[in-house]
Amino acid sequence: MSEKKRISIDPITRIEGHLRIDCEIENGVVTNAWSSGTMWRGMENIVKGADPRDAWMIMQRICGVCTTVHAIISVRAVEDAIGAKVPVNAQYIRNMILAAHSIHDHIVHFYQLSAMDWVDITAALKADPEKAADMLKGVSTWSLNSANEFRNVQKKIQALVDSGQLGIFANGYFGHAAMKLPPEVNLIAVAHYLQALECQRDANRVVALLGSKTPHIQNLAIGGVANPINLDSQAVLNHERLMFVKACIDRLTDFINQVYKVDAAVFAAYYPEWLSLGKTSGNYLSVPEYPIDADNSKFMLKGGYVENGDLSTFRPIDQQKDEFVVKGIKESGKHAWYEDDEPLEPWAGLTRPKYTGWQDDGKYSWVKAPTFYGKVVEVGPLAYLMCGLAANDTPTVSHFNELKGIYEKLTGNTLTTDQLHSTLGRIIGRTVHCCAINDILSAQWQMLIDNIAKGDMTAYIKTDIPANGEFRGVGFGEVPRGMLSHWVVIKDGRIENYQAVVPSTWNAGPRNEQDQMGPYELSIIGTPVADPTKPLEVVRTIHSFDPCMSCAVHVVNTENGEVTEVKVL
């Protein structure tokens, strides 16, 4: 007789809101799942009636982590509605901010937010620092991959253990049966975790210098950016500041290529089973990003759509406002706590809350369920990777092949495209995405320098909001967690309606109008769970989508009502 249990992991929190995952586990395997966003956003209602020029400043408050991306995509939506042109200098500056923000996001996710799902901190005490340094020879030239550095890190870990307080490493699933890294790899990972804390500061320095501060940048405007350019002035974007940005980019490049890329390959090498777990629908959607002209028509990063995991079905998306994309998006509230059940296009979308309590077969989430031509779609770095490989995009293919080469050198095995439809495939996709946008960050810096050298200092074109009439616009972007879109209706100079379809909506959504599971839900079906009170395996896959994390999760045993507190790192 089969044994069935239900667990509730609540909350797995993210900055956009709080996430609850419910699972039914039968004979040690997840057989059913529900993904529930447990906090209502409602930001769309806040901007109704507001001046469209203020929307970006308000909408970036949706999130405390992805602030920058919401600001930029909101500006694009209003600019699209009124037909505003953007000077190329402004595009370059926006792109540098977006790229640096995305690099910061990816580094923080891999090391600070998800690495502890795979790394046993205490096992690092058993490592041989000399052996750890030798393991990386031939795959990395990072200067801090030395026995002395690893020995110092080991001493720090020992001091934490001896104090009885593990600090930032407290409350992990250390000793869990699913932890498989050798002691030396655990030590390497902890060392790189600590080094990443310093490295990610360089990415934030770029955002803060160009955006005036971070989080919540201040330099945007409809029609450009508020960054006066004068190479000889002390108070604006000058030669000194631009060279400071270049120094930050150079340091980021070294860390990303010699540490981050290698570590992702190492994780894949030691956890091969996670190259077969975590698959969703196989439908992937991404949009082009990093515009380099005033009309938002030429981009440095390609987009596209892949269906059923078959790269031969790839359809390129060359424009952010491709009619194929705009017409395909609808959101359903059938299983969400809103009044309107039928799928609606975002311009007509309504945000009318209707809380009913949890209903397995009814409404159970504050997140709506987006579909693309009626299909469940995954967005994010894996979607970017699959579309980039299908398009034979040069930077995507190049960086993937480098990571693949490291994996094959470590294992002697071939990393196939079919294995990418997985939990670790998602992490590999994020790594490749980070490498590609780091190249773009460097290129955008050079393009800005070259354009200034030609005498072009323009960064803003004054644009008025029409006082009369109705205008509709949409801003798209390919941001760290995937395709983001903001949809605005402007009437008589004010915002009539506003909807944001965020990456987390696509991936964390509940069942749709056809009762099809969302990506989070699909991804954990078939996942083995060794210990229901420590559901590390479920958390690994959910974290691979890059939700921000909570420090405390509660697992409820419905058989006896016992609540077991579980700390998630």
Predicted regions and their residues:
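Catalytic-core signal marking the mid-to-C-terminal active-site face
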Residues: E496
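A translation/RNA-centric and nucleic-acid-associated enzymatic feature enriched
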Residues: H486-K491
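Active-site bordering "gate/hinge" segments
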Residues: M1-R481, D492, V502-L569
